[in-house]
Amino acid sequence: RRQRQMCIRDRITLGTGLGSGFVSNGEMIYGHDGFAGEFGHIIVERNGRECGCGRKGCLETYVSATGIKRTAFELMATMTAPSKLRDIAFADFDASMISAAAEQGDPVALEAFRYTGEMLGRALADVVTVTSPEAIFLFGGLSKAGKLIFEPTQWYMEENMLFVFKNKVKLLPSGIQGKNAAILGASALIWQQENK
């Protein structure tokens, strides 16, 4: 309900990739060609990780279930700290394993979440500068990690925020989670178009 009452809000999906949508006064912003909101494909690291879109350094290569998996493997190559993650083959590895390890205090997993939160928080600070939302809602698999992703994201977002926006934008978990989110979102868009 609180999502519907806000004038401007941004929604970020942290799943296998990174999806997003920008809503203003209850209306989805599509842009002139329907592709507005491709937040996952902003460049956050020049000549960074290769993305499926063909570019390098896209946000979703750092801030998604796939991105945090890549981060954890990169960290295992550079960190000497013991980690339960070292015993798992890359093909068998997923974000839920990183989350479970972080909950148990695994230093590699904790650093993977900190770094992921840093990348997301810095990017969200830029989005706030452009969209000036009342709130940003995170949902999707990676957001289920709770404070592991929300705390560093909030900290880095505030740390990099333009001063006029500091401490004014809420970062919240979406009330809609799981497989129903996409179905409900698509249904709402169709309903909205039919009732114009």
Predicted ranges, named:
Residues 10-17, 21-23:
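Short beta-strand segments
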Residues 35-38:
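Structural signature of FAD isoalloxazine-binding scaffolds in flavoprotein oxidoreductases
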Residues 11, 41-43:
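Conserved hydrophobic/aromatic beta-strand scaffold that supports enzyme active sites
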Residues 3-10:
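Conserved small/polar residues in nucleotide/adenosyl-binding loops
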